[in-house]
């Protein structure tokens, strides 16, 4: 076996074909913009979306890959990571659709915005499949630093600068906390960095090792909770969401959150299985706090972006029910809910962007009477908000049903009942917006709606917004009806991922996982 084939067998670069396509797209956008100039850069968003769709197709081709482990065990392209990476890529594609008009109108460069967004996408994709401590941290920082830049991209807007500074300071602290937890794992394992190898040394922790592992768990969860906006690590979310460019907020609410949950599942199930009772308890507390605080505080909000920020916190609490369940049904429901949450949440943000572009405000009171001036926008926002509230037969209803049923089967009766109660609370503030939009009396119409410009889709960048809105509404409506096939796909990704069976057969499963993840090395040796 020659040198090139040895390297190829050890690295198995085919596992990162989707990421390679995104990297190529990033280079094309960057170099193309330098060559043709900003004045003729109208093709850039469409090239970026085409590249992202190509990445989705590459993910489809990688489904049921018999050799998912690459880079000497550092990256795992199993079906679980494929679905999470797909959610992140699709969220980026929709974000670009809603960004074209928004960024152009702000007077900033669209190509640079898309390049930073694609870099954040790469960080999220690598984080979803990262199986090694260094790669986890590098991917996390790649996603985080790009997110800081995106948050402060509107340099002329003081609110954007303030949001970026807050996000940077709190994010840097959370990264340091997470890194300390990771360093404890490195030391406890005797210098191991592959997750499954670390887990092999913790199959029966004793005394001080068990205590140190619990301490590492607390620090690791603190870093993860920041990424998914779980209470009490949520303080940055409302301010950052309100001050950041709305397309960036949309990406953070879905893409960044999906990457955080992917990391949580892989890290907790693989490494922290010996202290599973502890991390289940912690995430139960986080879920309770997130559902209660997120939904209750959202009732008092006057800004749509702040309301959706607290809604995002509450939605993370609902998703954590599936994580705490710790069963195949629980993990499947997490994936399914994030998949439908992608469309209903980004659809809602698309409507917020359209309204703000036409009126210059995002205050909830200014939506009064919108139905009389823009029925399509009213319909789209209503469908997405009702789905977020869990109203049947929309996608959000079935997503919550799967989460609550998985929690009920796992014996989490109190957590499920609290989820049901807080879901009812959430319906109130969603319905409040819808009721305001459909008022019929002219005197109840807000000043912004009374002076609402004529609805037109001919301006530059409006067509992608229209396409994104229509797609979001259609998928949100149909995903509820077609929930069973989608849930079957989510379930297949879970049942075909060996690491998720570690809890049932710790020693045997971990050993088997180590063997499978080092297959590249074994092939190279032969």
From Swiss-Prot:
Domain of life: Bacteria
Membrane topology reported for the UniProt record: Multi-pass membrane protein
Membrane-spanning parts: 16-36, 43-63, 80-100, 107-127, 133-153, 168-188, 211-231, 245-265, 279-299, 307-327, 335-355, 379-399, 401-421, 469-489
Any Gene Ontology biological process: ATP synthesis coupled electron transport
Annotated localization: Cellular thylakoid membrane
UniProt keyword tRNA processing, yes or no: no
Chief localisation class: membrane
Thylakoid as UniProt keyword: yes
EC number: 7.1.1.-
Catalytic activity, reaction form: a plastoquinone + NADH + (n+1) H(+)(in) = a plastoquinol + NAD(+) + n H(+)(out); a plastoquinone + NADPH + (n+1) H(+)(in) = a plastoquinol + NADP(+) + n H(+)(out)
Enzyme class: translocase
GO cellular component, one term: plasma membrane-derived thylakoid membrane
Subunit structure: NDH-1 can be composed of about 15 different subunits; different subcomplexes with different compositions have been identified which probably have different functions.
Family the entry assigns: Belongs to the complex I subunit 2 family.
Functional note: NDH-1 shuttles electrons from an unknown electron donor, via FMN and iron-sulfur (Fe-S) centers, to quinones in the respiratory and/or the photosynthetic chain. The immediate electron acceptor for the enzyme in this species is believed to be plastoquinone. Couples the redox reaction to proton translocation, and thus conserves the redox energy in a proton gradient. Cyanobacterial NDH-1 also plays a role in inorganic carbon-concentration.
UniProt-recorded name of the protein: NAD(P)H-quinone oxidoreductase subunit 2
Organism encoding this protein: Picosynechococcus sp. (strain ATCC 27264 / PCC 7002 / PR-6) (Agmenellum quadruplicatum)
Annotated gene: ndhB
């Amino acid at each position: 076996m020659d040198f090139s084939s040895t390297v190829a067998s050890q690295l198995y670069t085919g596992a990162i074909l989707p990421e390679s396509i995104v990297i190529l797209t990033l280079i094309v956008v960057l170099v193309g913009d330098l060559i043709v100039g900003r004045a003729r850069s109208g093709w850039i968003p469409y090239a970026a979306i085409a590249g992202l769709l190509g990445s989705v197709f590459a993910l489809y081709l990688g489904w049921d890959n018999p050799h998912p482990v690459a880079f000497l065990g550092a990256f795992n392209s199993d079906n679980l990571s494929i679905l999470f990476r797909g959610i992140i890529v699709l969220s980026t594609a929709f974000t670009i659709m809603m960004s074209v008009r928004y960024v152009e109108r702000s007077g900033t460069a669209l190509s640079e915005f898309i390049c930073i967004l694609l870099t954040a996408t790469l960080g999220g994709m690598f984080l979803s499949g990262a199986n090694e401590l260094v790669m986890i941290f590098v991917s996390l920082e790649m996603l985080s630093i790009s997110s800081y830049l995106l948050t402060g991209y509107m340099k002329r807007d003081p609110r954007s600068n303030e949001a970026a500074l807050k996000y940077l300071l709190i994010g840097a602290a959370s990264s340091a906390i997470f890194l300390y937890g990771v360093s404890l794992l490195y030391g406890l394992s005797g210098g191991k960095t592959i997750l499954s190898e670390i887990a092999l040394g913790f199959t029966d922790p004793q005394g001080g090792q068990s205590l140190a592992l619990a301490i590492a768990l607390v620090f690791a969860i603190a870093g993860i909770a920041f990424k998914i906006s779980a209470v009490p690590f949520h303080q940055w979310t409302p301010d950052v969401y309100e001050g950041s460019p709305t397309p960036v907020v949309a990406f953070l609410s879905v893409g960044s959150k999906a990457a955080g949950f992917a990391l949580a599942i892989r890290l907790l199930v693989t490494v922290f299985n010996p202290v599973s009772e502890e991390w289940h308890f912690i995430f139960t507390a986080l879920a309770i706090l997130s559902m209660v605080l997120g939904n209750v505080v959202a009732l008092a909000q006057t800004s749509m972006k702040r309301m959706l920020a607290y809604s995002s916190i509450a939605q993370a609490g609902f998703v954590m029910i599936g994580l705490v369940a710790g069963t195949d049904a629980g993990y499947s429901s997490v994936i399914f809910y994030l998949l439908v949450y992608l469309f209903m949440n980004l659809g809602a943000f698309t409507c917020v962007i359209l309204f703000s572009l036409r009126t210059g405000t995002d205050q909830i009171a200014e939506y009064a009477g919108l139905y009389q001036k823009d029925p399509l926008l009213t319909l789209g926002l209503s469908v997405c908000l009702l789905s977020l509230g869990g109203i049947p037969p929309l996608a959000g209803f079935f997503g919550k049903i799967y989460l609550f049923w998985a929690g009920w089967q796992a014996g989490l009766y109190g957590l499920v009942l609290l989820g049901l109660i807080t879901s009812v609370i959430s319906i109130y503030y969603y319905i409040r917006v819808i009721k305001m939009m459909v008022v019929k009396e002219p005197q109840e119409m807000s000043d912004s709606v009374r002076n609402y410009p004529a609805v037109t889709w001919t301006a530059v960048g409006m067509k992608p917004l229209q396409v994104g809105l229509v797609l979001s509404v259609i998928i949100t409506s149909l995903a509820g009806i077609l929930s069973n096939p989608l849930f079957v796909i989510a379930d297949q990704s879970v049942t075909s991922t060996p690491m998720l069976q570690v809890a049932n057969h710790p020693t045997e499963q971990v050993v088997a996982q180590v063997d499978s993840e080092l297959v590249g090395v074994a092939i190279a040796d032969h």
